[in-house]
Regions:
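A short acidic, Gly/Pro-enriched loop at the edge of an enzyme's catalytic core
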Residues: 94-105
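A short glycine-rich, Lys/Arg-flanked "PGG" loop and its adjoining helix->strand segment in the class I
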Residues: 118-133
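C-terminal helical/coil "lid" or tail adjacent to the Rossmann-like core of SAM-dependent
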Residues: 3-5, 11, 191-249
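Conserved alpha-helix/loop element of class I SAM-dependent methyltransferases that forms part
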Residues: 19-35, 52
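Conserved catalytic/acceptor-binding region of the Class I
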Residues: 135-203
């Protein structure tokens, strides 16, 4: 098994996390949130979704968010310091051994970055109370749909991005494989809920959302690792941004929420 690749994160990545909310970016989860429960958010980023969960579980509940990127946690602690039932911890999932167990564990857009998602699910399972529940939200990157097609430079960048991920042991279609992964790790009552992200001009800040691939291309990591020439990376950003302003109609990112119980 490959070790999980270190993915470079910066302030732009922090901004992406800060823009997320429960209502817009984990829209079906609210149906299983109840006052008084204890929730663990694995890979919480800055805690922007965690704080929305904390508001729903209320003062008798608690949300613990963990993330292995320190700048995310530091940012979230500052932004959400007034949310008294939210605790944000800088730690890797596999090093996290709390005394208490959780009623619900959630993890959004995280397992896509791991080469060992099954081990991560087993670790999460060990942190659940009896009859506890898990909810995993993640992408199928192999079925991204742009309308119309973006410039060839961005198509080439995206193809390279998927290869870079695959070579690192990441599953580009983990959204489709989550039900079987949960079954293999001993969960039952498994549900798969379509949660596709659709962005067009009727959606608030849709240009920013479609522009996520310019932000991804903003990282030089694939250049440094020999996957991409820097000129192509810069060309992809420039031409894609122009396409967003002049041609883009919509983008659909395939996303599933998968739930299971123990």
């Amino acid at each position: 098994m490959k070790a999980n690749k270190h993915v470079q994160r910066d302030e732009q990545a922090t901004k992406i996390f800060d823009d997320r909310s429960l209502a817009n970016d984990y829209k079906n989860l609210k149906s299983i949130l109840k006052p008084g429960i204890k929730v663990l958010d694995v890979g919480c980023g800055t805690g922007s979704i965690s704080k929305d969960i904390a508001n729903i579980v209320g003062e008798n509940g608690k949300v613990t968010g963990i993330d292995n990127t320190e700048i995310f946690i530091l940012s979230g602690r500052e932004s959400y310091q007034n949310v008294t039932n939210l605790e944000l911890i800088h730690i890797d999932l596999f090093d996290f051994n709390p005394e208490e167990k959780f009623d619900l564990i959630v993890s959004a857009r995280v397992l896509q970055w791991l080469s060992n998602p099954k081990e991560a699910l087993l670790k999460m399972k060990s942190l659940l109370k009896p009859n506890g529940q898990i909810s995993i939200l993640d992408y199928d990157h192999t079925n991204l749909d742009w309308n119309p097609s973006p410039p060839k430079s961005m198509q080439e960048f995206y193809k390279t991005f998927l290869k870079w991920r695959q070579d690192a042991g990441m599953n580009n279609r983990i959204a489709e494989d989550l039900p079987s992964l949960l079954q293999e790790t001993g969960f039952h009552s498994i549900e798969k809920i379509n949660s596709d992200e659709f962005y067009n001009e009727e959606r608030h800040n849709y240009k920013s959302k479609i522009g996520i691939w310019s932000k991804v291309a903003g990282s030089v990591q694939m250049v440094e690792e020999g996957y991409l020439e820097n000129d192509l990376r810069l060309k992809a950003i420039e031409e894609y941004n122009h396409w967003i302003e002049t041609e883009a109609i919509s983008m659909t990112m395939k996303l599933n929420e998968v739930r299971g119980k123990i």
